[in-house]
Amino acid sequence: ACQENADRLLAKDNLIRVVPEGVQGIRKLFRDRYRLQRFGRGGYIRLCLRTRAPLIPCAIIGGEEASPLLYRFDALADLLRIPYLPVTPTFPALGALGLVPAPTKWRIKFGEPIQFDNYGPEAADDDLLVGRLSERVRTTIQSMLDNGLQKRRSVWF
């Protein structure tokens, strides 16, 4: 992610989407589905603090069943210089066709905006504060996921 581009977009009142879980979120095994991974180093929080932009938490339910990751060939992925090499119920058995996701129903939930007006731009340099705020966002989204999963009737509809 490029902080300068994010600053420029926010200065023009554009919306941006950040995925603080990063690659760790897409390379987690199926048994770990809907358990959020650590949220990186807090660059998105620093951005919100510097620009005073609100953060709208978003939880997506359904995507983790679309391509269930059963195993990762980490050593081979490292040799190929790719983030991960998946083994799913259909890949590599079906070749490239096995990379096509299953048709699951996705539910996208948006939470209440989290404001950072109580902090000045200098708060972006406070690593402890950034860590606490990042964990607050992570637990908010995890709670949204947990609630959505409890209400879901099926993966398919």
Residue ranges and their predicted role:
Residues 1-109, 113-115, 121-124:
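Soluble catalytic domains of membrane acyltransferases
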Residues 101-157:
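C-terminal terminal-subdomain/extension
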